[in-house]
């Protein structure tokens, strides 16, 4: 038994090391890639200081943090709702953040500062997450809870479409493209949003013990002495915060929170002591690679990153649905 435990521990360490190397390679590629490829040897030239340090570095850091936040949010929601298909985008949390942001633009008539828009996006994500938690407490089946989340997402999407369609504000119309997901407008002025993600990410990665208990189910967690009400509300707040900040930074980006935790579990990373940091590393790597594809796919334009992640993630999601139905 001890030998098996040591083998599993070594395998987990190897996975985390591989994911760390993958993330570093994706980060370096993201700093080099663009209309003008700039190799590391030219990073400190006048051209490199402009393109790498002023334009690409803040964007790359934002992509890295948002990818980590979305993947960890997916893992947390799957444990919270005891639902392997739970994910911020699929359950409407990302769209809720978008509704909060668009409501702030409408009510503030475009005069609100960026920090206020970010807080409204966070509030919208929290409201949808709390509604989903109320549904989960009614012991709905997996399929019904999933349908409830999809319905909430459709309602939020409809509200955003109506608001944008009837608006005469140029800023609000530009939000429609922004809600498809993209990091094109990110620079050092959004560094406060990046900093707002870091402490929550680090805190959740340290909460493997209650997460492992939650993954066992509500009855088992209670028997083990876990204060369910406290941890559910704290994790809901943390998840809503991460999703809201991510939407404020880059718009709605789907499938990262669904696919990454599933792939890691299939690879044997079921313990949240390894799964949570693994999700952070894999989510950051996946979104960095998707952002590189979005930047390089078209010569004179940039694809919305939400389109890239949906194109790559939708087939995986269908496969997971078929596998869950067997």
UniProtKB/Swiss-Prot annotation:
CDD domains, sorted: TM_ABC_iron-siderophores_like (cd06550)
GO biological process, one term: cobalamin transport
Keyword Cell membrane found: yes
Keywords for the protein's UniProt record, in alphabetical order: Cell inner membrane, Cell membrane, Membrane, Transmembrane, Transmembrane helix, Transport
Assembly and oligomerization: The complex is composed of two ATP-binding proteins (BtuD), two transmembrane proteins (BtuC) and a solute-binding protein (BtuF).
UniProt source species: Escherichia coli O81 (strain ED1a)
GO molecular function, one term: vitamin transmembrane transporter activity
Principal location listed in the UniProt entry: membrane
UniProt subcellular location: Cell inner membrane
Record's bilayer topology term: Multi-pass membrane protein
Family: Belongs to the binding-protein-dependent transport system permease family. FecCD subfamily.
Pfam families: FecCD
Protein name in the entry: Vitamin B12 import system permease protein BtuC
Transmembrane segments: 15-35, 61-81, 88-108, 112-132, 146-166, 184-204, 240-260, 274-294, 302-322
Summary of the function given for this chain in its UniProt record: Part of the ABC transporter complex BtuCDF involved in vitamin B12 import. Involved in the translocation of the substrate across the membrane.
Domain of life: Bacteria
One Gene Ontology CC term in the entry: plasma membrane
